[in-house]
């Protein structure tokens, strides 16, 4: 067998393993969702419900969301922001987990969701209606550089902004945009590793941001899954597949606090 053929087989096996893991994560999360009636049982978003078959994004993360541990570092930080920040703005809202959960928790008074996918916006509306927060949530399409013009000034200056837009953060958050958001607390999921010049893009973002904000970082850390009776009959591998958020590498978020 030639080296090229051997390498091809190895790569096919790796892709096959990745596919099998993803498929298993989705199956486990789907099963757990059914058992938990598609309802968050733990954490600050407790009692938030997902409409059946409304998940179009990251379905393998359902279990972590319902257990209140998905992106726990971000979730905990959001819940600790000062109460004067009563507006939540979600860029890359997906199916509304944060947009709706923050309203269900009553941590925020009003929300603004930006989601590029029509299917995503449909899911957000469906889930907002199910959770009876439809009147508190405004839903928009793709977030552009001037997305903040859609937000009343009195809400914008008291806002917390969560940004998860798969690399577009580097094109949207230029110095002018950051200047207009200087009164907000901003959390940015970083995707610099999507780009060959990602380090350069990240350094520029930080350089622009430091004119208006104090910059800190959050990183994915540990989870304790022994506390959930729903997982007591899962084997060790299954529990840790529920814990997995299916990421390509250790995730980092920037937190920007007004100076």
What positions do the PLM features span?
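Active-site segment flanking the S-adenosylmethionine/decSAM binding pocket
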Residues: 87, 93-95, 138-199
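Residue-level recognition of alpha-helix termini/interfacial anchor residues
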Residues: 133, 176-177, 209
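Residues at the C-termini of beta-strands that transition into short coil/loop
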Residues: 143, 190, 213, 219-222
């Amino acid at each position: 067998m030639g080296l090229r053929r051997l390498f091809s087989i190895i790569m096919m096996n790796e892709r096959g393993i990745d596919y099998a893991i993803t498929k298993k994560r989705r199956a486990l999360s789907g099963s757990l969702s059914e058992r938990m009636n598609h309802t968050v049982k733990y954490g600050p978003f407790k009692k938030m419900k997902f409409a059946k078959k409304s998940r179009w994004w990251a379905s393998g993360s359902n279990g972590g969301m319902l257990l209140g541990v998905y992106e726990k570092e971000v979730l905990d930080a959001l819940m600790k922001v000062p109460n004067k920040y009563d507006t939540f703005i979600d860029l890359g809202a997906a199916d509304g987990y944060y947009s709706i959960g923050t309203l269900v928790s009553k941590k925020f008074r009003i929300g603004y969701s930006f989601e590029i996918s029509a299917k995503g916006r449909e899911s957000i509306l469906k889930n907002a209606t199910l959770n009876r927060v439809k009147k508190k949530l405004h839903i928009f399409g793709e977030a552009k550089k001037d997305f903040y013009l859609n937000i009343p000034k009195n809400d914008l200056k008291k806002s917390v902004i969560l940004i998860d837009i798969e690399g577009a953060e580097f094109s949207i958050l230029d110095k002018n945009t950051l200047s207009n958001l200087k009164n907000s607390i901003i959390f940015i999921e970083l995707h610099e590793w999507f780009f060959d010049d990602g380090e350069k893009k990240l350094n520029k973002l930080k350089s622009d941001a430091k004119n208006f904000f104090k910059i800190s970082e959050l990183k994915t850390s540990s989870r304790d899954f022994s506390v959930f009776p729903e997982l007591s009959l899962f084997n060790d591998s299954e529990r840790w597949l529920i814990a997995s958020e299916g990421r390509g590498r250790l995730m980092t978020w920037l937190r920007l606090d007004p100076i």
